[in-house]
Amino acid sequence: MIVLSYQPKTFREFKKALQYGLENGADLLEVRGEKLNEKELLKILSEKSLPKIFTYRINQFSYSKIKDASKKYRIAIQNNVEFIDIDINLGKSFINKLKKEIQNTKLILSYHNYEKTPKLKQLISILDYSRKISADYYKIVTFANSVIDNYNILKLLEIANKKGVRLISHCMGEYGKSGRFLSYKNGSSFFYSSYNSNKQTAEGQISLEVLNKIFRIKQLYPSTRVYGIIGNPLKQSKSWLFHNFGFKLKKSNAIYLNFPIYDPELFIYYFKNYIRGLSITIPFKEEILKLPNISSKIIKEIGSANTMLFKDSKPILFNTDYLGFKEIVKKEKLLQNSKTLVIGAGGSARTVIYALKKFNNEILVTNRTYDRAESLASEMEIKAINPRKKFESDFDVVINTTPGNNFFLINLLKKILSQNKPKLVVDLDLNFKESKLLALCKTHKIKTVNGFEFFIAQAVHQFKIFTGKNISLRKVKRFVLDNYDKQF
């Protein structure tokens, strides 16, 4: 069931949240009672449009808070609230006294760890200890300090499901966001959402509107195929918008999630049986080739990949950056038979250079760390130029493959402009709305191609690899632009 969690101060605030919940498909509304007086609580309990969970969290225990919690739980029970959620730390005596008064209300007995996710053995012990007190549902929620922490929760759910225990379990925090979806898909009874990103009752909650409209949460089933993106950071990524809309458009039983990770090998080891395919972004496009994989001759020649499918748990690698950029080169004649400077020496730079070589370009590469530019130039059989020395020649085209708005990049373009004016600047950084590079080009009336065009071009190929289906470029492009400022 989908829960909208909210902490109102007044009945009026509650009514706004209730309306939002009804409009966006909530099954339950969790009312946090810490800030409510008795009069407002009674008004809320009398409103029956949505079933409710009454919850009272105590962060720092005191006699007055425990007394207030006890009083409000009793009011909720006496008014036949559908669920109460009681933290096991309130103790057996507190819980059993309330249980004696319960008639129609269902009990959720919960455990929270706001600092870390214990190891699986300890999580099992916590569940076993909780089950010594009879309840309708048990809840174990922990804080994720890495994406890997979600794996322990998934294994705990697997054990609970086998025992027939109704368990609500997921990780909180930024690293627990995608784990919430995996938990719900793999048997967690409830999915908790927020009113909006500013009114979360727990860190890592996602707004109900985004859950409903982007992720189609009501259509997340055990059979749903999971895709996602690995990299760090991922705040700038819009792949979740593109692919989830694509799945909706094509009626695919699939979902796409963000996985901000530090170690791709470790992530693949733990999650390869939960995920069907991945997009790969900075900083792992080159590193991913070091892992055991199945890949084509082109992937090996480029030296980077941005897409992965799992077949019998084995990763198959693709490079849709190459396919997408090649399309841009075909459309833009200035990217053919030109003298081109590529800025950057990572996986995207490799892909761009490989594509440009197919169209008779004279290619030079530079990078903040010149040694990396020299190494890449030697490998790709092109020329490296030192960004700190005077350039010996002019450039027809400049292509940026690095994350935008850094001082090195802007100062480098200013240096180029002091010597000559390129005919075209291509900025592969996705954040085109705030690109200082593109703004500088506009001032000098230089033609540009922005990173959004590149993103869409490669994502279309990626979607085809994931689903075997083509997608309407016009529709998906419009959707991503319309929802561009949404965050996951």
Residue spans for each PLM region:
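Catalytic beta/alpha-barrel core
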Residues: 5-7, 28-36, 55-57, 62, ...
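Glycine-rich adenosine-cofactor-binding loop
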Residues: 171, 227-233, 321, 329, ...
